[in-house]
């Protein structure tokens, strides 16, 4: 057996024996913890989950020949079961989708086989570059993405620590920051003189994408400049009923904003 073992380990025994009569020799096994038999552990292998940290594990082998004759027992040298490092079994990022400016949070599952208190160290990466390694006392489970951009790839890694030291580091699947939709910042005014309605839609895009303006619903004859958002409509002489207008702004990356309003006829004179 190794010089030091943890409760994650499984140990096994091999033996060589001679019989004066040339009979085949088998062995009876008994595993021991601090020289006391471990209940039910009488095979050639032992999962150390069956014992506790700090116990010294050994095994006693008793040779038996094919005629049932029993030889003297042999005991292995005892080996101490040392601290079993904590483990992290799953790491993820929430929410399920996010955009630049959102706050991300690491999710994880972890445990310590010895029942020790565990601290977790979180480290974040953006496009393969570390965003800094916090100390053991700084559990930076969240990440603010202000200043990040669409398409940034985010990863978080988690290292568990107990009093005996760190466990194995585990990282999440890459997490992609998504596109942000444009925002319309203007409001239309009523018809202008001589029955002419003009309105320039203004919009901004957080990702600085070029924007395309479109009329989804509009009265006959109304136009919009796709690159500037300027809306023009010469009201017909018979304009007497309300007209619905719906404008869409598209950033070319599946981000859209919409504005709806109603144009009403001017008061009769």
Language-model-derived ranges and their functions:
Residues 1-269:
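Ser/Thr/Pro/Gly-rich low-complexity disordered regions
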């Amino acid at each position: 057996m190794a010089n030091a073992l943890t409760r994650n380990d499984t140990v096994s025994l091999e033996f060589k024996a001679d019989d004066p009569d040339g009979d085949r020799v088998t062995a009876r096994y008994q595993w021991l913890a601090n020289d006391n038999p471990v209940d039910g552990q009488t095979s050639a292998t032992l999962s150390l989950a069956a014992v506790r940290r700090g116990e010294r594990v050994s095994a006693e082998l008793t040779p038996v020949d094919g005629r049932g004759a029993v030889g003297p027992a042999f005991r292995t040298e005892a080996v101490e079961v040392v601290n079993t490092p904590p483990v992290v079994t799953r790491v993820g990022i929430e929410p399920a989708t996010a955009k630049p400016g959102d706050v991300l949070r690491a999710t994880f599952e972890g445990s310590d086989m010895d029942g020790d208190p565990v601290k977790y160290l979180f480290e974040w990466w953006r496009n393969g570059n570390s965003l800094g390694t916090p100390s053991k006392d700084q559990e930076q489970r969240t990440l603010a993405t202000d200043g990040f951009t669409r398409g940034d790839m985010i990863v978080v890694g988690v290292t568990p620590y107990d009093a005996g030291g760190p466990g194995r580091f585990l990282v999440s699947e890459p997490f992609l920051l998504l596109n942000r939709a444009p925002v319309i910042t203007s409001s239309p005014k009523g018809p202008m003189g001589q029955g002419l309605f003009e309105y320039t839609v203004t919009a901004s895009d957080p990702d600085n994408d070029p924007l395309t303006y479109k009329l989804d619903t509009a009265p006959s004859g109304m136009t919009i400049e796709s690159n500037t958002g300027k809306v023009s409509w010469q009201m017909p002489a018979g304009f007497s009923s309300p007209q619905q207008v719906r404008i869409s702004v598209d950033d070319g990356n599946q981000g859209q904003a919409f504005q709806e309003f109603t144009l009403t006829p001017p008061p009769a004179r």
